[in-house]
């Protein structure tokens, strides 16, 4: 990816994290722990999920365990060909896409300000790690459905993921 495109992708990702946190801060305190709909996560759980995703990505970028791939090789091949390009191009995650087990939030409660601060810190740390590795040949991270994604792919997917959860919070 040319440097200008990388810079733009990273800026878009940082902006998406800011929009997500802004949407989370706009949730009234009284609604912070209330599920958005029956069987859905609360705003607090949405934020905890995003924080956990960043935590797992950061761990993998530091050389530790990332997400566990939950699809068979042939499923990954089909999904990478049929679904992933649309997500990256159009910025929409399919409805009812499963969250990775490693990033499913507990039931809470979650203290609002410390969680928002931790999410910003985790997102910023991952962005820094991605930038440090951008010129590393073969650098990639693991997605639980699509398998190994290149750094430009994961930056874009992260932007789409943040925007996905921003829209969910704004509908509350």
What does each of the following model-derived ranges do?
Residues 5-6, 12-13, 19-20, 24-45, ...:
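Long, hydrophobic N-terminal alpha-helical segment
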Residues 4-6, 18-19, 127-129, 138:
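N-terminal start-of-chain detector that recognizes signal peptides
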Residues 33-88, 124, 128-172:
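Short, contiguous alpha-helical
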């Amino acid at each position: 990816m040319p440097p200008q495109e990388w810079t733009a992708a990273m800026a878009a990702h940082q902006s998406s994290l800011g929009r997500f946190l802004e949407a989370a801060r706009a949730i009234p305190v009284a609604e912070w722990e209330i599920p958005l709909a029956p069987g859905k996560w609360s705003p607090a759980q949405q934020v905890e999920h995003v924080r956990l995703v960043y935590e797992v990505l950061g761990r993998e970028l530091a050389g530790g365990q990332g997400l566990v791939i939950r699809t068979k090789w042939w499923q990954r091949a089909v999904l990478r060909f049929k679904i992933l390009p649309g997500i990256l191009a159009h910025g929409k995650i399919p409805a009812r896409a499963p969250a990775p087990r490693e990033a499913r939030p507990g039931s809470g409660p979650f203290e609002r300000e410390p969680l928002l601060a931790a999410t910003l810190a985790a997102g910023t740390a991952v962005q820094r790690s991605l930038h440090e590795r951008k010129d590393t040949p073969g650098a990639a991270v693991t997605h639980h459905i699509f398998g190994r994604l290149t750094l430009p792919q994961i930056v874009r997917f992260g932007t789409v993921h943040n925007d996905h959860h921003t829209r969910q919070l704004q509908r509350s």
